[in-house]
Structures are given as C-alpha cells and as structure tokens.
A protein has these predicted regions:
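A short beta-strand element within the Helicase C-terminal
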Residues: 693-726
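Conserved P-loop NTPase-based nucleic-acid remodeling module centered on helicase motor cores
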Residues: 16-49, 53-62, 178, 183-266, ...
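Conserved RecA-like helicase ATPase core segment
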Residues: 382, 387-388, 541-629
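Active-site beta-strand-loop-beta-strand hairpin of nuclease catalytic cores
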Residues: 339-361, 393
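Conserved helicase NTPase motor core
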Residues: 25, 32, 53-54, 60-73, ...
C-alpha cells in the first residue's frame, strides 16, 4: 500500500458516513421547499402576464434562508445528491433562479412583450388615429411595478397614455374604476378623459367612465370621504386672497413690536446680499444688481449693494445727499478723470467714500488691473489719489469699507462717524418709512413674497427649522428676520381657514396624503397613470408615494419629458424624474425617440441646445421629416423697431402659405405676457393665409404650429433668459438649485424652439443679444463684447468730445474706448 493511502481511505469513509447522516434531512426538508420555490418561479415565467420586479423580490425574500444556505454549501449538496439527477436538477434550478433570476425574468419578459406586440398588432394599429410606433407599443405592454416613459417633444405622449389605458381595459380586463389618471390641470384631465372615451367607443365600442383627475380634485375627493362633507375652498379668487393679505399687513403693523420687525426687514434685509468677492467678473456682479433690482429709495442706480445701503440710511435719516456729484475742485488730468466721490452731504460739506476692500485692503481681480498694476494695486492707487485730494483741499472725508458690511457694522460705524462731524441723525417716523417703501412698490412685492413663501411652506410641510437648515450660513440672519414677519401672517391665515371651516389648495394634497398614510382613506387603484410627470412637486410626490405604500400591488405609469420641465417656480422638482429610481425604486424606463412634429434640422439644433446641460436625460430623437434648407433663422434688429420687423417676417410666412395654397398656423412666442406684440390685429389683417396666435413660451407647451417666431430674445432683466432671480428665501423651499446656468430658462427656450413644424424665426438684438443667441449664432454677432465686465457689448455713443464706444451695461460698467480703439 502506498504511503497515505490508508489515511485517504479513512477520510473518505468518515465523509460518507457524515453525508449519509445529512441525506435524509436534505431530502425531507430542503428539497420540498426547493420544489415549492421552483414551482412558484416557473409560474412567473411561464404565464400569460408580464413578470414584474416586486414578485421576484418577494419570492427571493421568502426563500432567503434556503438561498443563503445553498449558496454557502452548494458543492456539498451536489456531492450528497450524486446519482440523483432529478434532485440535482431541482437544486440547480433553484440556485440559478435565486442567483440570476433577474436575467431569467428579463428574457421571459422580452419574449412576452414580443408576443404581445404580435398578438395586439390590430389593436395598436387602430386604437389611435395613427398606428402606435414600436417604442410606444413597448411602453404600453411593459407592466413593471414602476414605469417611466421619457417622451421627447412631439413623440406621442398622449397617444401612449391612450394606448396604455385601452390596453389595460381591453387586453388585461382591468376594472376602469381601479385605473387612476392624474393630470396637472383640469383642462388636461378633461381633454384626456374625452379623448380616451372617444377612442374606446369608436374602436372598441365600449362606454367607459374615465377616472381622470387633477391632484387637487383627487385630494378634495379624499377629504370629502374622510370629513363626510365637501369642504369649502377658501378665497375663490386671487383678488380676494391678496385683499386678505393686505388687511393682515395693516392689522399687524398697528402693533409696535411687529412694526419694528417689519421695518427692520425692509431697511436691512429687503434684498439678498452677496459680497463682491463672491463674483468672478464685473458682469456677474452687474447681473446680480440688476436681477435683484438693487436701487436706492430715491430710485437711483448705484454701483453696489453697499452704496445702496448707505444711500438708504442717509435718506431714511433725513440727511440730504448727492450721489457721485463732481468734486468741487477741478481734478481732471491725463491720468485721472474728474473726481466724483460716492456721496456728498451739501448741508455739512462732507464727502463719503465707500471703498470695496477687505480687511487686507485687497479687491477682487475683476475690479480690473491698470497697465502694469494688479487690480488691488490699481485700486489702492485710486484710493490714495482720492485721499490726497481731500488732504490737499482740506475737505472733510468719511470712509467706509466693504469688510464692515461683511462684519455687520457698516451702518453702525457710519453713524458714529457722522455724529463725530456733528451730522444730525433723526430717523423718519415709522409711518413715513412705510410710505416710502409703499411708494417704491416694495411693500406689495414683499407681501407677494410672503404669499409665495406661505404656499411653498405649506405644500412642503416645512417647519421654521427646516427653512433655516436649508439656508446657507450667510443668509440665516436675513431668513430669521423674514420668519419673524412671516409667522404672524401664517398664523392669521390658518386661523381664518379654521374659523371659516375651509381648506386651500395645499391642504387638498397635504392633508389627503396624510389621511392615506393613516389609512383613514383606503383606495382600490390597481394602476396610477401620471401625465406630464416632469412637473411633479415634492408635495405631489409624497401624495403618490402614500397611495403606493398603502397598496403595494398598485402599479405606476409615468409619462414626461425632463427637457420640458419649466415650472420650478411653482414647486416642481425635475430631479424626481431624472432620479426616478431614487424616489420609487426599480423601474422600467423607455424613451419615445421618434418625433412627429418637426424636421431634422430643428430637431438637431434644439436637442443639442438643451443637452448642453449634462443633468438632462440623454436622448437621441429621430424624425422622418428631412429638409435640405435650414429652417431656423436668426434676425437681428433694434428693439424699438422689432414689431415692424415682426410684421415683415409674418408677411413672408404668409406668402409661403399662399404659394402652397393653404392656410397655415403660426405662433408668435414671447417670454412674458407684457411682451406680446401690440400690433397683432395689424399683423393678422396683413396675413390672411395665416392663423396667428400670440402666446408666452410657458403657454406654448404642448402646442404646435406650422411656423413660429420667438421674439425679443435679448439679454437683461426681462430678457430671454430672464435676468430676474428668485429671492433665496423662496429658492430655499424649492428643489435643490441646478448647477448649470439658466437651466430652467434653457428648457423653456427649448419648448419655444420645438413648437414649429416647418420653420422658426428668432428675433434678437445685436446690441443686447441673449446668451442663448451667442451660443446658437456666435458668428452672426457684429458687436464686440465689453472687455471689462464681459457681459455687455460695445456700442457707438456720442458725447461732448465726439463719438466713442461704450458698454451697454452703463452706468454699472463705465468702460469706454474712442472710435480709434484707444481706452
């Protein structure tokens, strides 16, 4: 016998004894459970229905103990069952399903979907006016627990919803009462209801009651069930609501302490403050000043936030001042222009200079270098020159600094310095101060801010702590001041609701979601279909989630286009769509990628434009509508003659329609209501072959026409993109801000660009072109950008010394160059 043979035989002998002892328990206990598990799994993948993820996850959870045990001891079990092919096959099947069940189910579902597409081909060809394309059919047939249909502009979003609804009724025999269709407006819900009913009657000869609702009407129905009566809606008009808020303001400001809080906010915190060093260019700072309408109470355009604060302090304390009045001594030289101190107090013959320096005397680089000097050195030279003038002419100078504002002592220090010079500091009465802010239209704007905040505060179910936690540190003091004036408004508002046994729109959703979570209302929906899903808000999300959590078998089918998410200002959160699985778990996603609206040139330009934002879901849309000529034209015109240029373009479109012997539809799209053309009747009369509608970009969503003109695509506060910014107090309650510049405005411009089937014209300005135009047509711009602020352009101007080139951002940017190019 060879060495080791006896030892090996003995080991084998004991192993056989061990496995013989285990074998009965495997056969009697584990194999029975495995057979049951495999039989269940086979039912999922050999049936006549789509197999969804939740079924598999529940199966896997049920058999987790067996799966874990077999995973650890698979080799031993195979050894034990040697020679028993049936049991080994069972063990193998279970192990395969447990470890790789997703792949097995995916293969089954692909086969199932292919079979359904074939079996339902007649249905898909006839249920809508035009046959559903393959992607639309696949979206209908997939029956996952959570389904996200990403529908590009013109790709048949509504067609897909109609197809899904009809498929559930006709093919899956779903009870219509268990299908809930949610839309964001009553008009959309009604249109969907009518369209589905008509198709069901015409094609399937079925009279079906369509359960299409808005989120609010669904919520109201739930509250009615819980209360056993239909609650009244408070303030049935916007006018009544605003009247109520004005009355609350007048009532609250009778109280001295509240009035002091209110005035404190108006005087110290009305506009959000950002220090100069927070900006990377002068142009950025100018845009911030303009976007937040940071002007003095005397309606002056000053160069900085800090100067406005100083001006308002002087004004509110009855100290007469002149802004940038030329110094009373002539100082003009080859090196410097005539000196103009920031403020002059004529009654006291005192000058005030506000220096934009930090504690180290430094300034941001964008303040501008001069010849061979860095920005800080150049600014310091300017400071020394100005101070030397006051010393030379023995004039009184008070100096303030940017770092004092950042430290919260700017006005306190200014007040002490003024007192040292004997300046009488006497604040206007509360009534006078409030009247000045009323006259400046600031109080109505603040009440509007409070109302907007109230709606978002309620709809998101925030607390004061939530609001402060969402705020950056440098805005917490301002936010705390705002909350002091907001809470009494909120308490009066809620008190009014209770006294009148009423609810508001926020209650319809928030309270309904609460009652669903508490099972005070139990639904029986098998399917929830949501249209325009990109517009969902966090409050509506919580409502939907409550419905799904209450009934795990309920399936969700959402259709939307993140490229067309344009309602963040009302609380919508596009990230709920772009991060769908984070909010709803595993989902089947499909992109409807064939547009039936516009041609390939409009498709390419618009798709490239919107996808510059990397956060948008990537889509490769396609179309069968191919054209040779470029259907997009950008026309540069002066804004004062834009309407005459608009008329010319419309007449040209009219001629094109006339040559075709047709009447064509046309949109004139503007960013704002006030910017709609005044001469629309004149245009329509001059263009009998056109049916013209003037609409805003927001209103144009979902609509289409043969031609479209997008007007006034310029830069500025009321430009496109909009130069106004939301108050941080409001944005703190909205979804997380997007990192990409003008993200929502970019999507809005995409919506405007994708309304035309055949041709689109964009009207812009060479003097104030929109940044979108700079991007779309950089070669078409003839004016040079300002090298100082970077956001303005240089245009020809006339002065006492003749023509020169100046920046369009004047008076904030005072860069000039003579016509020969000498600065």
């Amino acid at each position: 016998m060879k060495p080791g043979t006896k030892h090996t035989s003995l080991l084998h002998y004991y192993k056989e004894i061990f496995f013989d002892l285990l074998r009965p328990s495997i056969n009697d206990d584990i194999l029975v459970e495995l057979q049951q598990a495999v039989d269940e799994f086979n039912l999922y993948v050999n049936g006549d229905r789509y197999c969804n993820s939740r079924k598999y996850q529940a199966w896997k959870k049920r058999y987790a103990a067996a799966g874990t045990d077999i995973g650890l001891r698979i080799r031993q079990y195979f050894y034990i069952l040697r020679g028993k092919s049936i049991q080994k096959s069972l063990l193998y099947s279970f192990f395969r399903f447990y470890r790789n069940g997703e792949k097995v189910i995916d293969a089954y579902n692909r086969q199932f979907v292919a079979g359904e597409l074939s079996a339902c081909s007649t249905f898909f060809d006839t249920i809508e006016k035009y046959p559903l394309d393959k992607r639309q059919q696949e979206a209908v047939v997939h029956d996952e627990d959570r389904n996200l249909i990403i529908a590009g502009a013109g790709t048949g979003k509504t067609t897909t919803i109609v197809g899904k609804y009809a498929y559930l009724i006709e093919r899956l025999q779903t009870d219509p009462e268990t299908i809930l269709l949610l839309a964001f407006t009553e008009k959309a819900a009604a249109e969907m209801r009518v369209r589905i009913q008509e198709r069901m009657k015409e094609v399937l000869d079925k009279d079906v009651e369509i359960n299409a609702k808005t989120f609010h009407s669904l919520g109201l129905g739930i509250l009615t069930e819980v209360f056993d009566y239909k609650p009244d809606l408070v303030f049935d008009s916007e006018v009544k609501l605003r009247t109520f808020m004005q009355e609350v303001y007048e009532e609250l400001t009778v109280d001295e302490q509240y009035r002091n809080y209110f005035i404190e906010y108006l005087v110290e915190y009305l506009k959000p403050y950002k220090p100069p060093e927070a900006f990377s260019s002068k142009g950025e700072y100018i845009e911030y000043i303009r976007a937040n309408n940071i002007i003095s109470l005397k309606r002056e355009e000053l160069k900085s936030y800090e100067e406005v604060e100083i001006a308002n302090f002087l004004f509110l304390h009855n100290i007469d001042y002149r802004y940038e009045e030329p110094y009373k001594y002539k100082t003009r030289s080859r090196e410097f222009r005539q000196y103009k101190p920031d403020f002059y107090l004529p009654e006291y013959d005192i000058y005030i200079e506000h220096w934009g320096v930090d504690k180290n005397g430094s300034v941001p680089d964008w303040f501008g270098a001069k010849q061979d000097q860095a920005a800080t050195d150049a600014y310091q030279s300017k400071m020394e020159w100005a101070k030397s003038l006051h010393k030379q002419y023995n004039t009184k100078l008070i100096e303030t600094h940017s770092y004092e504002k950042k430290s919260g002592v700017l006005i306190k220090n200014l007040k002490e310095k003024l007192k040292r010079y004997g300046v009488c500091i006497e604040r206007k009465s509360d009534a006078e101060i409030l009247k000045h802010f009323e006259d400046a239209k600031e109080i109505p704007l603040l009440i509007n801010l409070i109302l907007t905040f109230l709606n978002l505060y309620k709809s998101n179910m925030y607390t004061d702590r939530d609001v402060l936690d969402r705020m950056p540190k440098d805005q917490q003091e301002r936010t705390a001041s705002f909350l002091r004036i907001f809470k009494p408004f909120y308490e009066r508002y809620e008190q009014y609701l209770q006294e009148h046994e009423s609810i508001d729109f926020n209650d319809m959703i928030a309270k309904a979601a609460q009652y669903v979570r508490e099972n005070k209302f139990v639904h029986r929906y098998a399917y929830i279909l949501i249209d325009e899903f990109q517009d969902i808000s966090s409050g509506r999300y919580r409502f939907v989630k409550a419905l799904l959590d209450q009934s795990p078998d309920t399936k969700l089918f959402c259709v939307g286009d993140d490229w067309q998410s344009i309602y963040r200002f009302t609380g919508s959160d596009v990230t709920i769509m772009t991060n769908f699985e984070k909010y709803f778990g595993y989902a089947h996603k499909i992109v409807l990628n064939k547009t039936y609206r516009f041609n390939d040139k409009i498709l390419r330009v618009s798709s490239d434009f919107v996808q510059k934002n990397p956060s948008q879901i990537k889509k490769k849309l396609k179309t069968d509508y191919l054209v040779r000529e470029n259907p997009i034209e950008i026309i540069y015109t002066e804004m004062k003659i834009e309407e005459s240029e608009l008329l010319k373009v419309c007449i040209d479109f009219n001629k094109q329609a006339e040559r075709k012997g047709t009447t064509a539809s046309m949109f004139i799209i503007s960013r704002y209501n006030f910017n709609k053309p005044d001469n629309i009747e004149e245009i329509q009369n001059a263009c009998p072959n056109l049916t013209i509608e003037a609409i805003t970009a927001h209103k144009s969503k979902g609509l289409e026409a043969d031609y479209a003109i997008i007007k006034s695509v310029v830069s500025g506060i009321v430009g496109f993109p909009c130069g106004m910014t939301d108050d941080p107090i409001i944005t703190s309650l909205l979804s997380e801000p997007e990192r990409y510049d003008h993200a929502e405005e970019r999507r809005l411009f995409y919506v405007a660009m994708t309304r035309a089937r055949d041709k689109m014209v964009i009207l812009s300005s060479n003097i104030k072109p929109s940044p979108f135009i700079r991007e779309l047509d950089p070669a078409g711009l003839s004016n040079k950008p300002c090298p100082d602020c970077l956001t303005g352009v240089l245009v020809k101007k006339s002065g006492k010394r003749g023509d020169f080139m100046g920046c369009t951002n004047y008076p904030y940017c005072r860069y000039t160059v003579n016509v020969r190019g000498e600065h």
